[in-house]
Amino acid sequence: MDTQAITIDEYNNDGSFINLYMNESIGEWCAYGFSAYGLLLFCKSNGYNALQSFSKGMQMPCLIITKEVLMQLLQNTTDITEQTDSHIGIRMPEKITMDAYRGWVKTLKGKLPEVYKM
């Protein structure tokens, strides 16, 4: 994974996008920062499981989904902005709520251990 590209993408994300990255070391798709929260909302509203944590290496929240959840996301999405073997960009119908995002990050930092080095 290109950590610099992830950092830049999330810096430029105004809360309207989900950027997903293939993490080759675990073989699953990951989202960071605002993207992770947007993806969490999608997973919760559709009853999908996801692993959530705070990445110490990236200094951002992280969400990991399986390929099956990714396929469901892509089937329910009409605005895919980019799709390669290692990165998928999706425009969400609505921006995330910043207060809710900050509360989620606080929760992750406070109680969830870092499961994988990301």
Model-derived regions, located:
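Basic, polar low-complexity surface loops/patches
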Residues: 1-118
